């Protein structure tokens, strides 16, 4: 949704149309667009407390998952080289493959015909698996070959707190709806760059 030079965005995906909540998503996008068009402010470069909405987290997470590939791991070009079975995230975060989760639109098999099974990739922040193709799996004796088609990021509180609750407890910060054109700056340490999109707001005293 566009209002002047500002845009707003919201989305949902589910197998059941009754779970899409189209009116709620539409109103959320409209509110963001209108709010973004109201007295925009410019902030100087610096370090800020940042709250990422789920879509923004997903954009960054997709790059992390991409970098879990075994080939670059064994070549030493992965940001996770020599970090298997070590903590790479906050201990309150875990990453699972959950193909049966109703909200993830999972499938029973991959595009290569491999079975998709429930599996653990990061538990309590500790990386315990890599993404193998058939070649690296055979080379390193990986069987069965697990995949990460339906990633589910689980967070314990306060990581799992709702966005509205995070906003209320933030004295000064930035709320990011989404990212666009995310690109790697340095793949070896997973430094990324990108642009915020569809609603970036200043938070002061717990309010946008």
Model-derived segments and spans:
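Internal alpha/beta scaffold segment
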Residues: 1-68, 72, 89, 128
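Dual-mode signal for accessory low-complexity, basic/Gly-rich regions
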Residues: 43, 83-208
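Short capping/connector residues at structural and topological boundaries
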Residues: 48, 62-69, 73, 78, ...
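Extended active-site and interfacial segments that coordinate phosphate-rich ligands
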Residues: 12-19, 67-77, 135-148
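Preference for short coil/turn "hinge" residues that link or interrupt alpha-helices
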Residues: 10, 36, 54-57, 73, ...
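Short, Lys/Arg-enriched charge-dense amphipathic segments
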Residues: 1, 60-79, 117-118, 197-207
């Amino acid at each position: 949704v566009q209002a002047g030079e500002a845009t707003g965005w919201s989305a949902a995906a589910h197998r059941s149309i009754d779970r899409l909540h189209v009116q709620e998503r539409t109103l959320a996008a409209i509110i963001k667009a209108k709010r973004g068009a109201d007295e925009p402010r410019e902030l100087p470069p610096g370090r800020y407390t940042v709250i990422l909405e789920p879509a923004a987290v997903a954009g960054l997470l997709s790059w992390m998952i991409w970098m879990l590939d075994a080939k670059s791991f064994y070549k030493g070009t992965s940001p996770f080289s020599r970090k298997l079975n070590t903590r790479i995230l906050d201990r309150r975060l875990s990453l699972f493959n959950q193909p049966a989760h109703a909200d993830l639109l999972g499938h029973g098999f991959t595009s290569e015909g491999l079975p998709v099974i429930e599996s653990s990739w990061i538990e309590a922040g500790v990386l315990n698996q890599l993404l193998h193709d058939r070649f690296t799996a055979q080379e390193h004796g990986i069987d069965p070959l697990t995949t990460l088609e339906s990633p589910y990021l689980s967070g314990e509180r306060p990581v799992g707190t709702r966005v509205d609750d995070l906003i209320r407890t933030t004295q000064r910060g930035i709320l990011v709806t989404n990212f666009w054109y995310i690109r790697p700056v340095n793949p070896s340490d997973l430094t990324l760059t990108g642009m915020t999109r569809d609603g970036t707001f200043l938070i002061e005293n717990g309010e946008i």
